[in-house]
Amino acid sequence: MKPSCYDNVGKAVKRKCETTIAQKRDISLMDTGANTYLIRPNYKDKFKAGVAKECIGEILREQLYGVQYDPEEVPTLSRSLADSIKHKLKDMAFDRYKFIVQVVIGEQRGEGVKMAARCFWDADTDNYAQEIYMNDSLFCVAAAFAVYYY
């Protein structure tokens, strides 16, 4: 198979290429938001686990008060809680942080539950907050992991 720069006879074909620029922009002067060279957050922008814990607890109390455990509703409720927590944390303006939210809901039957999480992260910038909610019917453990985006 011949390359596309040859015609059917085998002769080289010259191709003319023209480009036009419809809009000129100076990319170096564009406002891109956060500085790309920041590798550590300022103290005021750092993730505050205590504030996040209060936020998570408030959401759990509001949305789980009076709720009875129903295994059919738990998957939807878990996703709804995780989304609510994630959006509330994003609204708190922790700049350049990515959030991972995990919600576990189980039936309250007087049995013990052990949960653990392990992470490989930067101890100077990354952190987490968790909160536990319990009533007569269910327990809920919500954890939010905040990872600084370099």
From Swiss-Prot:
Disruption phenotype: Morpholino knockdown of the protein produces a dose dependent typical ciliopathy phenotype, with ventrally curved body axis, hydrocephalus, abnormal otoliths and small eyes. The few embryos surviving to 4 days post fertilization display severe generalized edema, pronephric cysts, and defects of the craniofacial cartilage. It holds the Pfam family Tctex-1. Gene3D superfamilies: Tctex-1. It comes from the Eukaryota. It is found in: Dynein axonemal particle. GO terms for cellular component: cilium; cytoplasm; cytoplasmic dynein complex; dynein axonemal particle. Keywords: Cytoplasm. One of its GO terms (biological process) is microtubule-based movement. Signal peptide: none annotated. Its main location: other. CDD domains: DLC-like_TCTEX1D2 (cd21459). GO terms for molecular function: dynein intermediate chain binding. Acts as one of several non-catalytic accessory components of the cytoplasmic dynein 2 complex (dynein-2 complex), a motor protein complex that drives the movement of cargos along microtubules within cilia and flagella in concert with the intraflagellar transport (IFT) system. Required for proper retrograde ciliary transport. Belongs to the dynein light chain Tctex-type family. This is Dynein light chain Tctex-type protein 2B. The gene is dynlt2b.
